[in-house]
Amino acid sequence: IVAGTTVQYASSATTRATITASMKISRDEIREAVRTLHGNNAGKLTRMVNPGTGFNTSPISACFIGIISHNTLFDLKDEVGWIPVEEYANKSDVMEGEVGALDEVRFVMTTNASTFASTVTVHGTLILGSDFYGISRVSGEALRNIIKPLGSAGTSDPLDQNSTSGWKASFVAKILNENFGLRIEHAVS
């Protein structure tokens, strides 16, 4: 999914190689990404989180989804307008791993977010719109549980001391419309 062709570079960078340590993700970068997705007619992935009666809570508009690293989260928390997930008015539609929202993007943090080697470590923040990608079932065994009981290893386990249990899974995802997703490449603090 990170291989999408719609790329935005932080600050004044024009390529990944020209990103410097000071070119961190910012609210302006997020707003520029949202503007690009709107211009590409990308749909939003979430519904509005309606306001509630709780103290110090905020409604959240319908949003695109951003996938970020923990290092990117550190920088985004300093941006004006950042709403941590704890301040959402209604937490029933919070996604697993969701950490907050900024402008029209709700962010999900993962330790598997993409990084690229360059003059500095470049982080790739994905901003996804509706129908950017699709997933499909794999025919046959998409999930297979494998159990080898004690003694099944023959002469390599003559005392029947080892048994194993494991699984194999197949998963297919494909980019459907390059214009409905965007990767922001940037440095982090």
Where do the protein language model's features map onto the residues?
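Extracellular/periplasmic catalytic domains that process cell-envelope and extracellular macromolecules
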Residues: S58-I60
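Short, glycine/acidic-rich hinge or "gate" loops at secondary-structure transitions
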Residues: I1-T6
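Sequence/fold signature of self-assembling virion shell proteins
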Residues: Q8-P51, A62-I67, N71-S189
